[in-house]
Amino acid sequence: MTQVTVKELAKVVDTPVERLLQQMREAGLPHTAAEQVVTDNEKQALLTHLKSGHKAKVEEPRKITLQRKTTSTLRVAGSKSISVEVRKKKVFVQRSPEEIEAERKREMDERRAVENAARQKAEEEAKRRAEEDARNQPAAGQPASAPAQPVAAAEPVREAPAAAAPAPASAAPSADARKRDEQRRPDKPRADDRNARGGDGDRKNAPHRASVKEKAPAPRVAPRTTDEESDSFRRGGRGKGKLKKRNAHGFQSPTGPVIRDVAIGETITVGELSAQMSVKAAEVIKFMFKMGTPVTINQVLDQETAQLIAEELGHKVTLVSDNALEDSLAESLKFEGESFSRAPVVTVMGHVDHGKTSLLDYIRRAKVAAGEAGGITQHIGAYHVETERGMVTFLDTPGHAAFTAMRARGAKATDIVILVVAADDGVMPQTIEAVQHAVAAGVPLVVAVNKIDKPGADLDRIRSELSVHGVTSEEWGGDTPFVSVSAKMGTGVDELLEAVLLQAEVLELKATPSAPGRGVVVESRLDKGRGPVATVLVQDGTLRQGDMVLVGSNFGRIRAMLDENGKPVKEAGPSIPVEILGLDGTPDAGDEMSVLSDEKKAREVALFRQGKFREVKLARAHAGKLENIFENMGQAEKKTLNIVLKSDVRGSLEALNGALNGLGNDEVQVRVVGGGVGGITESDANLALASNAVLFGFNVRADAGARKIVEQEGLDMRYYNVIYDIIEDVKKALTGMLGSDVRENILGIAEVRDVFRSPKFGAIAGCMVLEGTVYRNRPIRVLREDIVIFEGELESLRRFKDDAADVRAGMECGIGVKSYNDVKVGDKIEVFEKVQVARSL
């Protein structure tokens, strides 16, 4: 075997020689020099020594000490500061594996001992019961001696308190063992032992129970008989006279899917839907996530989405309406009384500038059109006029395209529509729209052909154009009266009123003046001094000052009523328009008004409508976002013009919102970030500042606080009183945001007839100009067989060895193309220019 010295061994184990000699001395080996030989036995002895030393170190519990120091500064009076240093120290000791193993063994021994004791007690209890059954068996088998058994068994029961007192310790273990034995037998229902006195009493009652079971044997799962229940009363103690109840579990797992009836209202949350289907909300959320709709448990779903989910999960859906409150309100508003004839409500409709308001002016003998900005109507005006033939209520609607919703409301609230058509202008887009609104509302038409005093008036042309849209004059065999009028001269106005009142007689309009007032909102605005003001048209009943009214989602008590001339009135009957003050907000035009006797009822219905409107709006907005998720992916690239819009009345605000949101295209859009009725306030200015928006005031002005913020922050605020102007300005702003298009104009085309070589420019094309003019230093394209093969710049242009700025059609020239020498005979050189063109919507 190879001899190994201390030095070689130190080199093998990668340890200094001095360190190895020291370890060998500690191991009791005689080596003192590096050249001494180490045998295998000595190596083994050294290895054993090193292992034992390492094991001792390992067995020592390892400690980890954590120290933390935090320094803070405490300020005291007099601008002084005190440095506070907090030191914390924690020591963690790791337990050895031997300790952990010993503890585990100890726990197992204790558990095994407990189980053995329990098993031994169970065996003793079973043995004791077997002995009791053996003792009771002869008593049941001998009927002659049976009467003596109850007496013998009853005596210990009466002496139970005295007998149980000396040995309570022996009674408790038997009760515990019996309880464990009952738990091991699941097929026998357990009795309610909460009122039991202990095992001793049960043991004394055992013979009595055995005799009862012998008298009425029954299977364990069968219901208990009357005798069994009567004998199950506890005897003695607190439980005297109480019947023992069986605690058998009645739940059975369903073998198939459970189909439930799910009632879904207009809105429902995910949690409510899952509760009705008896499934976890997480399952519904997971199902909707698979459908591509991420929701939360409190997400409000609209009726259609909830119906789809419930039906997909296999349940029956019943769509219900959450209008119990509305139904009770409708029942309370029913009124029976004597009906009388009422005045007709007539709406004047037609295209803009066709003379609607001027015609009403002549009828009212008042100059209303002069007071409208720009001479066009921008509000719904309501007036009632006393004529020789009776009273007529007129509604004047705007004719501009932006006021479509106003015209639709006017048609719904009216009995007869006067369609004004200019004789010199003919049928226009808003004229056709007015006809459609009247037909949709089922309202009869009377056509007033205005401006017949102008040259070029053609009545037959208007009859022909209107007949295309289903309006046929009486002269042509239809049922629509046509009346020629002149609002300026007053011609034909009496005949027009005659036709209107004739239509009203045919309709037989009735109303009940003694009923509570009911009507519709024509217009609403926010007055700085008087608060919300609503113009309402009373359709039935009588509206009185002091009435509690419910208008849409607003309510209030009428503090004052004004007629169309601004004069206060105490009451208003059917077909009378009035302004009412006292509402808690500005209602939307078209909202229904009802008089209620109870303020509490009005408040309850108003709050219900507000919450319902908010829930439906949120549900629809969320559904819209999910449906258009892919369409909206590119919306972030759109340029947006933010606008804060304030108007004098609610109808104009709605019309402006619709008109402005309709502007824009795929690259630019308008977003009305805020709006309302009333003047521009400080909060509106702050909203415009935060959203980088433009402030627009339509027939309103800004207060001092808003003007101060606008001046300090340099906001853009503009006032308007004509709807044309605001729409035109927004169009110009959007056009500026579009930028410009680059358009190419072809200036000239030259054909290559020959190719020359120049030491300075390379290949020179001898060309004939075919079309237009060829200019130097302009971009060109080289076409070969009408295919673009090069695009560059025209570097050299000569005519008879002289440089030329341009060469016209029909002349020859030499053309040098920059950085291109592959010119061939027959190629065409196209000279063009790029022009920036402003874009428009």
From Swiss-Prot:
Record keyword Nucleotide-binding present: yes
Biased amino acid composition, Basic residues: 235-248
Keyword GTP-binding assigned: yes
Localization (cell): Cytoplasm
GO cellular component: cytosol
G1: annotated span: 350-357
UniProtKB keywords: Cytoplasm, GTP-binding, Initiation factor, Nucleotide-binding, Protein biosynthesis
Molecular function per GO: GTP binding; GTPase activity; translation initiation factor activity
Basic and acidic residues biased stretches: 96-135, 176-217, 225-234
Region (G5): 486-488
Low complexity compositional bias, start-end: 136-175
Protein name (record): Translation initiation factor IF-2
GN (gene name): infB
